[in-house]
Structure formats: structure tokens, C-alpha cells
Amino acid sequence: IYTYQNTRLVIEEPEQNLFPESQQALINFIVERINAATCQTGKPSSVVITTHSPYIITAFNVLLKAARAEKIDAEATYKVVPKNAIIPFSDIRAFYITDEGTLSNILDEEVQMIGGMELDHASDIVEDKLSLLNDVMYGQAE
């Protein structure tokens, strides 16, 4: 990554064949390398990641939240997230491709994190079915 003046890295579905903990470690590694390349060259580098994994979104949200926590207590923040893995909210973009094929911005300006509710819709469906099956097994709550 350090050979060029700046880097544009595209990664498709990094979650493939990785457990959730490994997904988070991979995102931290990628962000650390991109930040290091930017620092070393003085030129902005970037990464584009396509994903359908809520774990990847959550990993990015941890790094985004760390940027806010860093302003309150940097030393305590660095014990949780490495300094060179932190992402300022202004440095990230996140989009969802709608059923109509258009891009929808899923950044939540208020909490300064990635929304991603669209990605986790499958979890809602599973939870609804589990709830219905619990009703069958244990009777409906009255």
C-alpha cells in the first residue's frame, strides 16, 4: 500500500468465510493500513467495501464511535480501539442499494454511525417467526 501516492482499495464481501470476531479484526486491520498509507504519503487513501454483513457494519460503527469517545478521553479510548483504527464520521460514506436499484444513504447524522436497518431486516423476520413459534409452544400471552 505504501508504494503509491495514494491507494484506492475495493473489497467485495470481506465477511465471506469469516466468523464475526474475524470480521471485526479484518476491518480494524484494513482501516489501520489505509490510515497508515494516508499518514505516510500525506495523500488521502480510501477503501470501498461491499457487504451484507451486520457484523461488518457494527465493526465500522465501533470505529466511528471511538472517534467521538476519543474527544472525551483519548487514553481510555485507545485501550478499547487502537488509535490508528479510529474513523472520523466525516471520512466515511455508507449506502444501501434499494429494491429500485438506487443508492440510499444509511449514515445516521444524529448518532454519527451507520444505520444499516435495511441489512438487518432478515433478523427481524427470524425474530418474528421465533416469537410465533414460542406462541405455539408456550401459548399466547394474554
Task: Give the positions of each predicted feature.
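Switch/communication elements of ASCE P-loop NTPase nucleotide-binding domains
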Residues: 1-124, 139
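Aromatic (Trp/Tyr) and acidic
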Residues: 127
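Conserved helicase/translocase motor-coupling segment
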Residues: 131-142
